[in-house]
């Protein structure tokens, strides 16, 4: 009778309801199973009015300019906005609606992600040497707003969810929340190749997140990768009819995670557990201790790989070994029970993983009309 079955769907209720019972009893009401009074009549759920709307806006705009040869300046702006609204009414003909004498609810949420990215990309070739350098800055803003209202004990089902004030509930439920977080990044990347044979890439990122306290907001994450396309060497030229591609790769990189929400160092809640006279009064309480030294979770990974292609790409083999360590794991930590507030978000430890992966792709049939690839 708590409303879960009304919201779970007709099929769930139909699977659990006694099929020997008629749809309606002798009084014209929906029949109920006396042995399972918590199960609603599945046909009665058709009387529920449930309307959900969703609006989503995905937009992106960019500007490019080439002030000199080889230099590209680009500004990119994007938005991802998702708005949802749910309106529901459980009439007195349903099990839960009858117990609540009609129950109405409205909820709406607005989730937005704004992005600005500015980059400068420079490419230069000097003989057999190719250089590409990129520097940039990005800024992201995440916002979320939610509102909900519920009421019950209506004199008639005719209002549906259009007049919550018509309900005679002793304590109508009203809720709202809002969150905002920001991410700023500065990054750079340098690519170098020599004769398309030796390859080197180095990157550096500095990411700042408002999810952490002011002294711990910035994390620095470097990476470097080197490659050798050995099939371009002259001493392997006689084998190119068989070994069409061969590349050895080695890389090391660091990435960061700040996904802890925006309340990791300041978290309060509102509860109605304060009794004054015959009334319960809302109050604010600390539900989670703040952590001013909380910092980025960092993943460090080594990777060694070998790519081989045979018979003009008809057979391709990739072998990789990786070793990954994730340190300063972000997680909720339970404190000793005698603390009045016994929860805190902390950097709790680290994990380690390693493994070997082997992938083989073969193109068994390839012509202008059809191709077949097996893996």
Predicted regions and their residues:
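Phosphate-binding loop that captures ATP/GTP phosphates
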Residues: 16-24
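Extracellular/periplasmic, surface-exposed regions of secreted and cell-surface proteins
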Residues: 1-12, 31-90, 99-375
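Charged, amphipathic alpha-helical segments characteristic of ABC-type P-loop ATPases involved
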Residues: 24-26, 30
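Conserved catalytic cysteine-centered active-site region
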Residues: 95
């Amino acid at each position: 009778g708590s409303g879960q079955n009304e919201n779970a769907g007709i099929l769930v209720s139909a699977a659990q309801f006694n099929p020997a019972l008629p749809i309606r009893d002798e009084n014209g009401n929906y029949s109920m199973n006396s042995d399972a009074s918590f199960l609603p009549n599945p046909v009665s759920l058709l009387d529920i009015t449930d309307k959900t709307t969703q609006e989503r806006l995905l937009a992106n705009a960019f500007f490019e300019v080439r002030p000199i040869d080889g230099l590209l300046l680009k500004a990119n702006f994007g938005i991802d906005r998702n708005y949802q609204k749910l309106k529901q009414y459980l009439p007195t003909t349903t099990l839960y609606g009858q117990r609540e004498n009609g129950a109405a609810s409205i909820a709406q949420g607005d989730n937005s992600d704004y992005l600005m990215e500015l980059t400068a990309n420079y490419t230069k070739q000097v003989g057999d040497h190719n250089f590409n350098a990129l520097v940039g800055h990005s800024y992201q803003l995440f916002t979320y707003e939610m509102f909900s209202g519920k009421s019950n004990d209506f004199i008639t089902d005719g209002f549906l969810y259009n007049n919550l004030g018509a309900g005679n509930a002793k304590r109508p439920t009203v809720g709202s929340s809002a969150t905002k977080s920001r991410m700023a990044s500065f990054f750079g990347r340098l690519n170098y190749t020599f004769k398309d044979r030796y390859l080197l890439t180095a990157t550096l990122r500095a990411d700042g997140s408002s999810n952490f306290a002011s002294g711990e907001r910035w994390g620095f994450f470097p990476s470097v990768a080197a490659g050798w396309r050995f099939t371009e060497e002259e001493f392997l030229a006689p084998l190119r009819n068989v070994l069409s591609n061969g590349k050895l790769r080695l890389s090391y990189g660091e990435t960061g995670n700040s996904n802890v929400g925006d309340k990791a160092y300041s978290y309060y809640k509102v509860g109605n557990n304060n009794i004054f006279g015959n009334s319960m009064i809302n109050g604010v309480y600390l539900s989670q201790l703040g952590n001013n030294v909380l910092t980025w979770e960092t993943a460090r990974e080594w990777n060694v790989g070998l790519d081989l292609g045979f018979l003009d790409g008809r057979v391709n083999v990739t072998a990789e070994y990786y070793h990954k360590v994730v340190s300063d794991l972000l997680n909720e930590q339970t404190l000793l029970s005698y603390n009045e507030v016994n929860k805190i978000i902390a950097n709790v430890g680290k994990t380690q993983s390693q493994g070997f992966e082997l992938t083989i792709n073969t193109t068994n049939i390839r012509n202008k009309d059809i191709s077949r690839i097996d893996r």
